[in-house]
Amino acid sequence: MNRLPSSASALACSAHALNLIEKRTLDHEEMKALNREVIEYFKEHVNPGFLEYRKSVTAGGDYGAVEWQAGGLNTLVDTQGEEFIDCLGGFGIFNVGHRNPVVVSAVQNQLAKQPLHSQELLDPLRAMLAKTLAALTPGKLKYSFFCNSGTESVEAALKLAKAYQSPRGKFTFIATSGAFHGKSLGALSATAKSTFRKPFMPLLPGFRHVPFGNIEAMRTALNECKKTGDDVAAVILEPIQGEGGVILPPPGYLTAVRKLCDEFGALMILDEVQTGMGRTGKMFACEHENVQPDILCLAKALGGGVMPIGATIATEEVFSVLFDNPFLHTTTFGGNPLACAAALATINVLLEQNLPAQAEQKGDMLLDGFRQLAREYPDLVQEARGKGMLMAIEFVDNEIGYNFASEMFRQRVLVAGTLNNAKTIRIEPPLTLTIEQCELVIKAARKALAAMRVSVEEA
């Protein structure tokens, strides 16, 4: 039987939510009630699958904890009042921490002035952010298209490459095995995990995948495409594969890919949605090899953990294909004043506080600690790897990875697996994590592994 719409029910639900938003604090009973409501509504109206997924990190196998607010700059508080050091960072959005006061203030000030733009008049913050990114990004990157997410930034990059290369008879894209570029149709065609791809086959034609980090495989693919007339429009890469398991290519790989792109007349698209904004110890990961892409994709941390925003930045030569008709690719909310205010404030914080350098220093400290633990627990840990504050601990199998996340949860440290590699737990904290908190994370990991070893021995 079809359910009839109920304005009264919708009004009551929205009023209840607004009441919760307005409250600074909730008492114990209100927290318990909220926890029950959230679990019920996820099951009935969001997706019950998320509840099972969250089980993997919850003490006692219960449904996932319900977060309620940020604690400090680097912590989260759940509805039970428990505070967690955030070593997941919202999959890389909290580079400048939770509720960074500079970012929050910029958004609040803009909110009081003008939340959204008219779509007809020129909006100043979009212009200022584009100018800022032109100054900040490497090489000849000059023009920016703004959107709302990493997937959208990749879609824009693919369309831009198509528009530029189609008159040249080049239509093929080369991506890499293990890549993750998003889940919309175009981005998914470049993504390499079958679990995400198969339900939506056939995807866009013209995409090929080669092993990541293998420059000879890349050369062979470019050659074969040329021989068959399927000339390559662009190569799309992550400098470090984030969702693939924090996979670092061999030194010099990006430089070699850049040379191949130049040799074959292919554009180089770098997806720095996860590696950008200081995460790896440089503002952009491509700067470790001084590589200059033709198109750069940003999102996640660009909004400072306060507003969603993505950006696709390209050289003038490439971007000029949109000059005659700027409406070929647009989005209603892309580049809105609130998002641009957040991005401008985020860039200001990253530069003023030199957070990329801090990411390198604290990342080295954490990675040294994790590698020591890998040596102490070779029966559980295969490897610890990473660059800056993008790290991974790879376990011998998926179950051990899940158990580690659950044990870390008990130690009040939030971690999670990567989307393409379930036995790999990512460590991706805010770049603002303190030295003391770094030490606490290493201690928590040591306790977690010790508890896991006891559990294995008793089994």
From Swiss-Prot:
Cofactor needs: pyridoxal 5'-phosphate
InterPro entries according to UniProt: Aminotrans_3, Aminotrans_3_PPA_site, Class-III_PLP-dep_AT, Putrescine_aminotransferase, PyrdxlP-dep_Trfase, PyrdxlP-dep_Trfase_major, PyrdxlP-dep_Trfase_small
Annotated EC: 2.6.1.82, 2.6.1.29
Binding site for pyridoxal 5'-phosphate: 150-151, 274, 332
Alphabetical GO biological process terms: L-lysine catabolic process; putrescine catabolic process
Modified residues (N6-(pyridoxal phosphate)lysine): 300
GO molecular function, one term: pyridoxal phosphate binding
Record's catalysed reaction(s): an alkane-alpha,omega-diamine + 2-oxoglutarate = an omega-aminoaldehyde + L-glutamate; putrescine + 2-oxoglutarate = 1-pyrroline + L-glutamate + H2O; cadaverine + 2-oxoglutarate = 5-aminopentanal + L-glutamate
NCBIfam families linked: PRK11522.1, putres_am_tran
Family: Belongs to the class-III pyridoxal-phosphate-dependent aminotransferase family. Putrescine aminotransferase subfamily.
Protein name, entry field: Putrescine aminotransferase
Organism: Escherichia coli (strain ATCC 8739 / DSM 1576 / NBRC 3972 / NCIMB 8545 / WDCM 00012 / Crooks)
